[in-house]
Amino acid sequence: MAGRWMDLGMFNARGLAGADALGIAIEQMVTGIASPVDSERGLAARLRYLTKTDAGYEAMDRAGIHVSPRTLMAWLAEERSPNRANLARLDAAYWDLRRRNVATDLKHRLNSNGHGTRVEINPVDQTRVDGRHQRDLSSRSLNVRGIWDRAVDAWIDDDVQELDAIWDEIIQDLGSEYDAYSNVSSIGWAA
């Protein structure tokens, strides 16, 4: 991570690390079942999605769902309902599988046939910072290409260090004031 803003809140500036903002922005591209897991419809949809493929069973295993086939069949037939802990695990498994399933599409959309994606970077919020400590920062936008496959893979793997390295590559294109954008209030794009 770039250096001078390591102690972000020292003068009451508010924001988050660029790597975190990058992960959040990718996460916001993932859509799925809107019904809550504890609703009849939400549970049924998640169970159908998870039991359709071997990858779904692997996602349930990663989420810590270790029930007998008989119990799983009872859930699918709506004869029994999972307890709260298993509902949370089912939801986690669903979103884990959903992320993995949409990764290829995300890479395709963000790479945009080699054209990349225009990213808007909003600087840290300095409204609470005393005037003498404020920096003159404006929203910046730049076209980002060549990093999206790595970024999506790092996001899937929850690899914060790799996302941080990617963010540093992105902000290098901002020129001499890149360091001021190591922390941001938000980033966004339309992909």
Describe each PLM feature range.
Residues 35-55:
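Short, amphipathic alpha-helical "recognition" segments used to contact nucleic acids or chromatin
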Residues 25, 29, 46, 89, ...:
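Charge-rich, solvent-exposed alpha-helical interaction surfaces
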Residues 2-5, 12-20, 103-191:
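Intrinsically disordered, low-complexity, charge-dense segments enriched in Lys/Arg
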Residues 64-82:
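Recognition helix of helix-turn-helix/homeodomain-like DNA-binding domains
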Residues 85-100:
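DNA major-groove recognition helix of helix-turn-helix/homeodomain DNA-binding modules
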Residues 1-42:
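Basic, amphipathic alpha-helix used for nucleic-acid engagement in HTH/winged-helix/SANT-Myb modules
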Residues 50-63, 68-70:
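Short, charged amphipathic recognition helices of the HTH superfamily
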